[in-house]
Amino acid sequence: MSTALLEARELSVRFGGLTAVDAVSAAFHEGELVGIIGPNGAGKTTFFNALSGVTAPTGGRLWVAGRDLTSAAAHHHARQGVARTFQTPRVFGELTVAANVDFGLQFGGRGRSGSRLLKDEASILRLIGLTDLAALPAAAVTPSQQRLLEIGMALATRPRVLLLDEVAAGLTEAEVEAMAQLIRRLRDDLGLAVVWIEHAVTTLLRHVERVLVLHQGRKIADDAPAAVVRDPTVIEAYLGDEMAEAAA
């Protein structure tokens, strides 16, 4: 297989005596759509923070497209093509929707080649379905639209890896399905490695090809969805029999 776009090798994050991420290894390749699930407090977001340079690992190594970025700050990760969203969308409420996307372009996108689908502000707004809201302040759009906008801002940096942290949280059932379809389109049309944390487990398992399961900071599974929902360790630690049956 080709060099991973993003690879964690025995990655750990400790806060004093608390180990939030415990020697997790995982590799993500171009065109992959990978889900990460686990109970609250499993270390999922902390793992994302380490992958994106927001939090410095305290052990292990982190490689981006073959470069060791273990100790690098978040902006170095972004310059190498790693973009992410957050559980609570981080948009500039006083700026227009279009200006938020333009911020992403100015930050990292203009100097890097990318798909024609990401060539400019208008193209990105069209891709995420916010063209008609371009002139509105970001604070004036709905929470679900702010989630889409944050994805647009991430795409504007023309990433190779897109890390999505609970982008379906708080959405209606129809909005969750629409979000999942958008995520698949981004993977299919842009060739990104997409890594998606989500508590809407049944939706996530329908759309990803591989699932990592974290529990108490450790990786307890890394396999196809069909295998994960039958894994006794995963069922005991997180899914339970009822959820496993629903997701199967």
Regions found by a protein language model. Give the residues of each.
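Glycine-rich phosphate-binding loops of nucleotide-dependent enzymes
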Residues: 2-248
